[in-house]
Each structure stands twice: as structure tokens, then as C-alpha cells.
């Protein structure tokens, strides 16, 4: 294991205490000691704030983390709390390969830049443990067959040879860094089942020191680990890199919304149903940028796997985290997953000693606000067609879908004519079979994603649905692409041991890979004859998946409606073959006896599910899969690389290139100066996601990125995905704002990455227009609506924005991670004042924009913006500068956080 985080050199508050377990004495930094010395009512704090407080208490150094940070945070929830940012230094960082590759590319580039000025490149090394889990690269090229897993894995290694060689070099070249090989599982499930310690116990100066396991991760669903009492959240790769290199994350003291759970889930409902309902409730509550902490009697009714499912969805409900404190169930899960019994005793003793152990009779913490969720009122549901917060009760799914068909095109509508509902197409498949697809036909049914494939209750449930369906003689229609991508090999183990996997295979839910697959858009192609027929007839087809995101254009370019559902519901809908059905009342199909088969005929009871989970999910299964996790993938271990400190960049590589972020960087940082002469390159509406800004999926051959790759000799069949090519800025610049579903209001009549180049009036690709503006040394601006940058913690959404020459984004509101990423890349986030937006101000996008920002700017200041139209008329308005802390102004001066880190390392060297 990598080196651990060091504690502070001095015990400033005399808070270092001891506890004893199993005959050993452990040191810890006592929160009670703060309260005893009169520094705040610490015992009343939310558990999540206590973990934050322990982190700053333990790491006070008088420079980065000061006494005032501790004293202030201890006064959380009182009138004495000051507007001082929290400097958070997590104990570790976790990466996945789509975001991890560009992060490691940046580290390699930092080393090159350091060496270029005569510095020591070894100064660029992670200072805390970093785990990278390779899970995002496998694609579902083949599905529904016995050899699908092997074929997809072969293609994964073939496509990603350059990337994997680079990551293999990194594990040798960097300290404190290890990589979990491909085909192991999904990062968050591997974290939950294996990597997380919950409490660290390290030897320091001859003494054993304990403290909470905390982390940041380059994936927004890092929050899944909150389910076991580990505080952590997703950040952009840029922020994670800075954290690896010793920089704290700064953020305002968070509000904490208490989510009080009462009651018990009814029979027939799942953790997925609850998670989707929680997402809807908390989105409506408004928790963006806030912590959510779960408490109340309902917690005791939820197994750890269900808590992890709910915590996983925190980005979808908008919260920074969705925290469940450590309790007896967390300890039970550590036992279930085969953790060391002595360490589990340390976890319990530490948490009890430091007031971090939750018990049913504990007094409720003090929260900013409380929302109550009654588990007994949860019903089976789905979410869609384009956002995870748009909840649809199962009983209302058909009715809702019919309304969505004819509703105006947008988040909850497709904008079709009423007669489109009855459209159908008939054609032959390659095997000669005839098929009929109608509006609403399900083209993809995928059991996928970290959210649900970590949960044995919903996976066993899906297997039981399959078993009952097969026994009754039901089959999946031949146009449905079915797939099963478990989050870890443990899942396969218990599906085999329970005898359910053969039934899932019988319905086409064969193993396709251990990774994110369909949930992130790696759904692979549909059969060519299906793609041709659907495209030719413009048929509206759908997907049903057990994922966490269903944004437009994400799952498959031809699939316009995407619905999130539990794994058992995915199987049920796959059997039906359409979302235009009332599963509660209509027959799903006809059985082998000629009788109609209904939903209740195949739906398992909780007693059936619980019995199989208890019988088949065992500690031995977890130990078996993880004891040799770093050695099992021979192809990974046979990759030949060097351990040299400096990476040998290959100019001909189309996967890995040295990015230009540090070219022509001055020794000293610049100043905050007014922005003049900006042209509008994009004018967008609400809910522009990071998928819209920087897609992860397929690269079209006629897109700027596709043309670049073809010029480099890459054939379209070898394009791979945008996500896999995030180590090459040339591809990613061209892919910025290239989502096929993005709608730019200043390129009317188009869909996709187009804009109007104002000097000539020509409609062209956003990339080509930006390059022309760059030649003219014209800065650019983007105008947007609410929730700009929602979705994945995709740093390339900000990196690409920067490289295109966009100097500022003016939006009605920003999602947390993307706003931070813009600042980290030296792009100014501005927010319209409440009640104003581009349309209310009469902005068409043709204007020249000026922003009066300078060295006097402070966090959340109002600045004057002028929009000068073609006739010279000026619209003047004020916007909020979304620097949320003083240090963010420094990042902006430096041109970005990595430039600041490099300048500091240069001085040290």
C-alpha cells in the first residue's frame, strides 16, 4: 500500500488522546477535547462536519491549515461561524481511467516542465496514496453470447494498448500510486469492497495513529463510499492532481441538510426505487453545493448496499455528498467483505472514542435544515427520459411516455406528432428473422453501473425475475440488445452460486465486461440492420438501464429516450420490449402454455431475495476475488514499460500527447484584468451537462475530432471513444461542445457542435470557429441557463473550454464541480443576477462582450458587463463573480491551479 497521510507536527489544541483495543494503544485527535476546552458544541455537529473538523484539527500546521480554521469549523451552525473557507486535505485520491489518464498525463507534463527549467522532476510525485481503477474502457461490442466477455476484453486491450502502456509506466514511475487492472470491476464498487479502510491506522514515530478515511475522486459518483461512513466526493481531475501534490481543496463551510429516513420499504420495491425518489425529493429541495446527511430510524432498515446505492446518486440530487455515519451495519459490511477482524475492532473503537459512531438512540445532530422521507411510501419507479431527477411511477410509465412523445422537445418531451405513437417498421435481421419495432421499442436493456451492480439485493432480484420468466417460457424480443456488466467479480460469484446466472444468459443477459459500459455511453453498436432501419425511418427508440445518468445523447446516438430503473425492472422491460406498456396491468408476454404472463408472475418477494443473499454472499467470496487482485490479469502484467522519471512522448500517438498548458508560462503569475472584445461562441439553455460540453462516447467520422484522427491514419472503426482519448488534447479540443444533441441557439436549424462565426455569418463547427477567433486573437464567451455543467466531474469540459479560447462563461447557475474546474483552468465563471438571464436582457449572441473585472475583485463580487450590439447600442448589467474563495482568485491569476503548483514546485526545487 502507498505511504499514508502524515499528521500535524504539533498538537496545537492538546487534543491528542489514546484508546486501547486488542492489547494495542492507538492515538487519535479528540473532538471532545475541543468541546471540553470551550471551542464549540462539537457533540451537536453533523457527523460529516465532525469528520471535516477532525481533518483540520489533525493537520494544523500554522501555514496552510491554521488554528482559526479549527476554531471556526467547531462553531458550525452558530452565529459565530465566520465566512472562512475550509482547507481540506483528504487522506487519499481515487481515479478511474477516463479521468485518470489525463490526470497522469498532466503529472507527466509537469515533470517535463520542471525538468525544462532545471528542476528535479521527482518533486512531482503524489504525496498521498493514489489508487487508479481501470473500468471505463470496456465497450459492449458483443452482447448476448457466451464469448461476449472474452471478445470485448480482447477489443479493450487492442484499442487501449497505448493508454495501458502509459498507465503501466505511471505505476512504476510514480510513488504512492497503484493501478487496479482492467476487468476487475467498477471503481466505486472496488473502493467499497476492497480499498476503503473506513479508519486509517498508521505507525508514526513509533506510535499508532488513527484517523478517518477520507478521499476525493475523479468521478462524480465517488460519493458511493459515503454509504459506509467514508467522507469523500467527486472533483475534477485538475483538483485531484493538486491534491495529490499536497494542495488542499478549499471550499466554503457547507450547509448540511439532514435527510430523515422513517418507515420501511414496502415489499416489491428496491433500493433503486428509493434512490430515484431521494433524487427527485432532494433536487426539488435544492441541495447543490451542500452536504446531505442521512439519519433517523429508517437507517436501521437499510442494508449497507442500499445505503451505497443512495449515496452513489448524490451528484444526481446535486449534493456534494450523501453521508451515512459509521454504525453497526457498516461494521457488519466490513465483516461480510472479508476485512481483517482486528482492523474492524480498530474502526469501532476509534469511532466510538471520537464521537463518530451512530446508534439508533443517539440524539439527532443539528442540521441547517431537515427533509423527511418515508420509506413506506416508496413505490416501483423509473426516471427519464433525459434526466435522473424526472421520476415516473411504474404504474404511470405508459401514460407518461405517451405525454412525453407529444410534449415540446426538451428535458421531458420529444416534440413528435400524435400519429408517431403508432409508427412501426418491419425488416429482416442478418440471421433472416423478421422483426417489428414500434415507437418506444427498447433497443438497449442493460444491467450496468456502479449505482446498482454493487447491490446483491437488486442483482439477485434480477436473476430471480429471469428465472421465473424462463421457467414460464418468456423470451426477449430479437431487437433488444441485452447486457450484464457487474461492478466486481464478486457479483458473478454469487450469481453463479445462486444458480441464477444461466437463466440470465438464457434471456441474453450474458457477461459483457467488468466496467461501466452502457452507463457511460460505452453501449457499443446496435446491429447494423437495426441502426439502418431506425435511422432511415426516424423511429423513436429507447433504452432501459440500471444506470445513474440518462442525459440526451449519452447512451447511444440513435436512442432518444433513456429510462433509469432497477435491475429487476430492466429484465422485465427487456421481456416486454417496449416502454409503451403498463407493466402493472398489461401482459408482458405469452408463456409456453399459451397463457398471458403478467408482472406479478415474475416479480420476486423480498423473502426470496433475502434468503438467497444470505446463502450466497459470503466473506470467502470477497477474499477469493481480492487477495490476488493485482496479479490476476496476465495481459496487464505483461505490458512492457520503463520506470524512467520522464515519459517518452510519441509525437505520432493519437492517445497520449503532451498538453500545452505549461507552454510559454511566465515565472510570475499575471494579474486580474478586464476582458474586452469577447464574441459569443455559444448560447445555450438550461441543464447543459458536461456530456454536452465534452462527450465521452462515440466519435463521428465527420466531426472535427473524426477528421483529425483520419488525417492521422486512424480508420473510423478504430476511433474508440472520446473518453478513451482524453490523453490527447488535439482530440479533446475538437470534441468540446461536439455532443450530437447539444443545441446552440446562435446556430438555428442545427443540432450538434455548430455555431455562427460572426465576422462572416458562416455557420461552422464550434472548433473551427474558435480556431479562427484564436487567429484573430479574439477572446470568447459562452452564455447559458440554469445548472450549467451538471453531471460528470469531467475536467475536459473545462480544459476544452480553456483551449478553445473561451475566457468566461455567463450562466444562470453552475453545478458545483464544473464551476470549480473552470476556475482551475483559468476561465472566469460569471452568474446572472437572480431573475435575469440572456433572454430577459435581450442578448442575441451577436454582441461584443466586455467584463469589468480587475485586481480588486473579491469572492462573489458584482461586476459590470457590457454587451454592445451591431448598432453600437449597449446593454449593461451586473453579474456575480463565481470565485467562491480567496484562493480561487489566486488560481485565476496564475492561469490555473496546475500553473500555480508548478511555480511553487519550481521555487522549492
From Swiss-Prot:
Keywords: Iron, Iron-sulfur, Lyase, Metal-binding, RNA-binding, Tricarboxylic acid cycle. Its cofactor is [4Fe-4S] cluster. InterPro entries: AcnA_IRP_Swivel (IPR044137), Acnase/IPM_dHydase_lsu_aba_1/3 (IPR015931), Acoase/IPM_deHydtase_lsu_aba (IPR001030), Aconitase/3IPM_dehydase_swvl (IPR015928), Aconitase/IRP2 (IPR006249), Aconitase_4Fe-4S_BS (IPR018136), Aconitase_4Fe-4S_dom (IPR036008), AconitaseA/IPMdHydase_ssu_swvl (IPR000573). Its EC number is 4.2.1.3, 4.2.1.-. Disulfide bonds: none annotated. Induction: By citrate via CcpC. When citrate is absent, CcpC binds to the sites near the citB promoter and blocks expression. When citrate is present, it causes a change in the interaction of CcpC with its binding sites, resulting in derepression of citB. When citrate is very abundant, CcpC activates citB expression, presumably reflecting a change in the interaction of CcpC with RNA polymerase. Also induced by decoyinine and nutrient depletion. Pathway: Carbohydrate metabolism; tricarboxylic acid cycle; isocitrate from oxaloacetate: step 2/2. Disruption phenotype: Cells lacking this gene show a dramatic increase in the concentration of citrate. This accumulation of citrate prevents sporulation due to chelation by citrate of divalent cations required for proper functioning of the Spo0A-initiated phosphorelay. PROSITE patterns: ACONITASE_1 (PS00450), ACONITASE_2 (PS01244). The keyword Glycoprotein does not apply. It catalyses: citrate = D-threo-isocitrate; 3-hydroxybutane-1,2,3-tricarboxylate = 2-methyl-cis-aconitate + H2O. Pfam families: Aconitase (PF00330), Aconitase_C (PF00694). Binds 1 [4Fe-4S] cluster per subunit. [4Fe-4S] cluster binds at residues 450, 516, 519. GO terms for biological process: propionate metabolic process, methylcitrate cycle; regulation of sporulation; tricarboxylic acid cycle. GO terms for molecular function: 2-methylisocitrate dehydratase activity; 4 iron, 4 sulfur cluster binding; aconitate hydratase activity; iron-responsive element binding; metal ion binding; mRNA 3'-UTR binding; mRNA binding. Monomer. PANTHER family: ACONITASE/IRON-RESPONSIVE ELEMENT FAMILY MEMBER. Mutagenesis of different positions (F662L, R741F, Q745E, I810T and V853A) on the C-terminal region of citB gene product shows that even B.subtilis mutant has high aconitase catalytic activity, it is defective in sporulation. The defect is at a late stage of sporulation, specifically affecting expression of sigma-K-dependent genes, many of which are important for spore coat assembly and require transcriptional activation by GerE. It strongly suggests that aconitase RNA binding activity may stabilize gerE mRNA in order to allow efficient GerE synthesis and proper timing of spore coat assembly. Whether aconitase is active as an enzyme or an RNA-binding protein is determined by the status of an iron-sulfur (4Fe-4S) cluster that is essential for the catalytic activity of all aconitases. Citrate is both cotransported with iron and a chelator of divalent cations, including iron. If the intracellular citrate level becomes excessive, iron will be sequestered away from iron-containing proteins, including aconitase. Since excess citrate greatly stimulates aconitase synthesis via the positive regulatory effect of CcpC, the cell will gain the ability to metabolize citrate at a higher rate. This is Aconitate hydratase A. It comes from Bacillus subtilis (strain 168). The lineage of its organism: Bacteria, Bacillati, Bacillota, Bacilli, Bacillales.
Amino acid at each position: 500500500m502507498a505511504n499514508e497521510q502524515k499528521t500535524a507536527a504539533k498538537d496545537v489544541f492538546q487534543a491528542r488522546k489514546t484508546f486501547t483495543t486488542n492489547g494495542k494503544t492507538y492515538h487519535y485527535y479528540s473532538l471532545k477535547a475541543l468541546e471540553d476546552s470551550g471551542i464549540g458544541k462539537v457533540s451537536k455537529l453533523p457527523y460529516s462536519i465532525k469528520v471535516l473538523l477532525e481533518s483540520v484539527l489533525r493537520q494544523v500546521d500554522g501555514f496552510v491549515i491554521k488554528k482559526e480554521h479549527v476554531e471556526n469549523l467547531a462553531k458550525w451552525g452558530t452565529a459565530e461561524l465566520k465566512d472562512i473557507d475550509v482547507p481540506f486535505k483528504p487522506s487519499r485520491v481515487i481515479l478511474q481511467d477516463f479521468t485518470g489518464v489525463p490526470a497522469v498525463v498532466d503529472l507527466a507534463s509537469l515533470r517535463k516542465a520542471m525538468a525544462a527549467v532545471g528542476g528535479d522532476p521527482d518533486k512531482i510525485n503524489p504525496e498521498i496514496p493514489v489508487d487508479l481503477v481501470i473500468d471505463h474502457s470496456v465497450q459492449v461490442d458483443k452482447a448476448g453470447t457466451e464469448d461476449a466477455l472474452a471478445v470485448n476484453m480482447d477489443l479493450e486491450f487492442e484499442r487501449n494498448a497505448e493508454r495501458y502502456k502509459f498507465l503501466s509506466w505511471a505505476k512504476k514511475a510514480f510513488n504512492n500510486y497503484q493501478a487496479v487492472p482492467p476487468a476487475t470491476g467498477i471503481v466505486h464498487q472496488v473502493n467499497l469492497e476492497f480499498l476503503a479502510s473506513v479508519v486509517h491506522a498508521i505507525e508514526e514515530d513509533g506510535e499508532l495513529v488513527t484517523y478517518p478515511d477520507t478521499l476525493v475522486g475523479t468521478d462524480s459518483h465517488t460519493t458511493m463510499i459515503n454509504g459506509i461512513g467514508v467522507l469523500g466526493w467527486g472533483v475534477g481531475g485538475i483538483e485531484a492532481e493538486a491534491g495529490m501534490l499536497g494542495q488542499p481543496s478549499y471550499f466554503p463551510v457547507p450547509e448540511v441538510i439532514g435527510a430523515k429516513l422513517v418507515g420501511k420499504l414496502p415489499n416489491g420495491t428496491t433500493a433503486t426505487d428509493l434512490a430515484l425518489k431521494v433524487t427527485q425529493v432532494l433536487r426539488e429541495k435544492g441541495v447543490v453545493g451542500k452536504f446531505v446527511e442521512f439519519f433517523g430510524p429508517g437507517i436501521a432498515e437499510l442494508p449497507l448496499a442500499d445505503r451505497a446505492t443512495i449515496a452513489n446518486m448524490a451528484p444526481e440530487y446535486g449534493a456534494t455528498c450523501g453521508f451515512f455515519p459509521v454504525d453497526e451495519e457498516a461494521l457488519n459490511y466490513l465483516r461480510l467483505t472479508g476485512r481483517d477482524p482486528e482492523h474492524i475492532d480498530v474502526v469501532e473503537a476509534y469511532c466510538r472514542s471520537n464521537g463518530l459512531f451512530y446508534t439508533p438512540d443517539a440524539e439527532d445532530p443539528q442540521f441547517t435544515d431537515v427533509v423527511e422521507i418515508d420509506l413506506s411510501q416508496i413505490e416501483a419507479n423509473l426516471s427519464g427520459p433525459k434526466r435522473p431527477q424526472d421520476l415516473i411511477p411504474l404504474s404511470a410509465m405508459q401514460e407518461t411516455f405517451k405525454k412525453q412523445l407529444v410534449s415540446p422537445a426538451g428535458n421531458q418531451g420529444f416534440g413528435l406528432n400524435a400519429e408517431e405513437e403508432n409508427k412501426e417498421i418491419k425488416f429482416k435481421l442478418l440471421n433472416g428473422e423478421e422483426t417489428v419495432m414500434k415507437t418506444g421499442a427498447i433497443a438497449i436493456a442493460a444491467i450496468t453501473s456502479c449505482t446498482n451492480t454493487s447491490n446483491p439485493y437488486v442483482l439477485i432480484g434480477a436473476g430471480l425475475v429471469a428465472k421465473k420468466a424462463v421457467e414460464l417460457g418468456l423470451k426477449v424480443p430479437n431487437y433488444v440488445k441485452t447486457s450484464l456488466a457487474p461492478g466486481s467479480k464478486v457479483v458473478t460469484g454469487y450469481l453463479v452460486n445462486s444458480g441464477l446466472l444461466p437463466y440470465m444468459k438464457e434471456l441474453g443477459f450474458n457477461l459483457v465486461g467488468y466496467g461501466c459500459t452502457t452507463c457511460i455511453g460505452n453501449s457499443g453498436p446496435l446491429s447494423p440492420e437495426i441502426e439502418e432501419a431506425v435511422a432511415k425511418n426516424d423511429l423513436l427508440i429507447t433504452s432501459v438501464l440500471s444506470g445513474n445518468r440518462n442525459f440526451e445523447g449519452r447512451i447511444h446516438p440513435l436512442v432518444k429516450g433513456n429510462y433509469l430503473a432497477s435491475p429487476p425492472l430492466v429484465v422485465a422491460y427487456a421481456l416486454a420490449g417496449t416502454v409503451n406498456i403498463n407493466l402493472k396491468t398489461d401482459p408482458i408476454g405469452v408463456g409456453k402454455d399459451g397463457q398471458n404472463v403478467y408482472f406479478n408472475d415474475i416479480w420476486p418477494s423480498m423473502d426470496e431475495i433475502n434468503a438467497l443473499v444470505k446463502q450466497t454472499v459470503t466473506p470467502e467470496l470477497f477474499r477469493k476475488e481480492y487477495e490476488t487482485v493485482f496479479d490476476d490479469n496476465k495481459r496487464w502484467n505483461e505490458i512492457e514499460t520503463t520506470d524512467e522519471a520522464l515519459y517518452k512522448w510519441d509525437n505520432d500517438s493519437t492517445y497520449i500527447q503532451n498538453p500545452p498548458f505549461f507552454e510559454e508560462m511566465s515565472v510570475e503569475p499575471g494579474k486580474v484584468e478586464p476582458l474586452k472584445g469577447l464574441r459569443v461562441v455559444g448560447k445555450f439553455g438550461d441543464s447543459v451537462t458536461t456530456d454536452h460540453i465534452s462527450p465521452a462516447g462515440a466519435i463521428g467520422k465527420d466531426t472535427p475530432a473524426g477528421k483529425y484522427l483520419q488525417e492521422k491514419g486512424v480508420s473510423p472503426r478504430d476511433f474508440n471513444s472520446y473518453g478513451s482519448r482524453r490523453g490527447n488534447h488535439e482530440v479533446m479540443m475538437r470534441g468540446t461542445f461536439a455532443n450530437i444533441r447539444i443545441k446552440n441557439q446562435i446556430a438555428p436549424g442545427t443540432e450538434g457542435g455548430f455555431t455562427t462565426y460572426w465576422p462572416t455569418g458562416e455557420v461552422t463547427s464550434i472548433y473551427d470557429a474558435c480556431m479562427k477567433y484564436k487567429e484573430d486573437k479574439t477572446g470568447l464567451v459562452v452564455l447559458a441557463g440554469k445548472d450549467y455543467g451538471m453531471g460528470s466531474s469531467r475536467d475536459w469540459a473545462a480544459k476544452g473550454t480553456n483551449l478553445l479560447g473561451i475566457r468566461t462563461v455567463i450562466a444562470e447557475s453552475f453545478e458545483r464541480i464544473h464551476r470549480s474546474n473552470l476556475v482551475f483552468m483559468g476561465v472566469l465563471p460569471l452568474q446572472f443576477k437572480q431573475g435575469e438571464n440572456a433572454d430577459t436582457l435581450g442578448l442575441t449572441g451577436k454582441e461584443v462582450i466586455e467584463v469589468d473585472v480587475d485586481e480588486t475583485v473579491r469572492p462573489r463580487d458584482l461586476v459590470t458587463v457590457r454587451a454592445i450590439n451591431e448598432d453600437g447600442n449597449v446593454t449593461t448589467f451586473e453579474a456575480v463573480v463565481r470565485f467562491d474563495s480567496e484562493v480561487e482568485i489566486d488560481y485565476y491569476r496564475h492561469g490555473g491551479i496546475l500553473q500555480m503548483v508548478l511555480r511553487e514546485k519550481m521555487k522549492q526545487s
